[in-house]
Amino acid sequence: AKVKAQPMGPTAPEVWLLGSSDYSGALAAELGLRFAFAHFISADGGDQVMRDYKRKYQPSPREAEAHALLTVFVICAETDAEAERRAMSVDLRRLNMDYGINSPVPNQREAETRAYTDVERQRIAFHRRRVVLGKPDTVKAKLLALAAQFEADELMVITITGDYLTRLESYRLLAGVFELCQPA
């Protein structure tokens, strides 16, 4: 028996290639696919990868033109200081990953009470280069600057914090500052 998905839409879904290297950008260009650069994985050289993708793009039956999306890790809060505080749980999670510990994102209290060595503070600073954080206006300005620098056609954000409600608030504040929803 044949299996047929229902309902059938008028078009096929868009195909994206998510990557964080020049290889993935070149592959997306060669195959005529949309490309999402994973800034949240690697911020280094991504702007050049995006420019090369657009320059080398080969139209395909699926996509006539290049389309580039920038995926960014964001933590938005009412104040810059609060965003910095909320980032601490992710800082500790990334340190744990550096140590080979694959555990859930720690809660805020655990992150705030942890004593860090100088080397760990350096690792935190290294990882923070891939994060946009702050109050809504700060985050908006940084995201728009990144979009221009990377020549992105679209932005996509990912927010990870120590609890669901702060993630939800981050998205709500972003939606508000970008006027994507009606104020509550």
Model-derived segments and their meaning:
Residues 21, 41, 74, 161:
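Residue-level signal for short, function-critical loop segments
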Residues 14-18, 33-38, 66-73, 153-157:
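Hydrophobic faces of well-ordered beta-strands that scaffold small-molecule active sites
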Residues 10-13, 129-130, 161:
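Short, contiguous strand/loop micro-motifs
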Residues 1-31, 48:
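Internal, glycine-rich beta/alpha segment that forms the wall or movable "lid"
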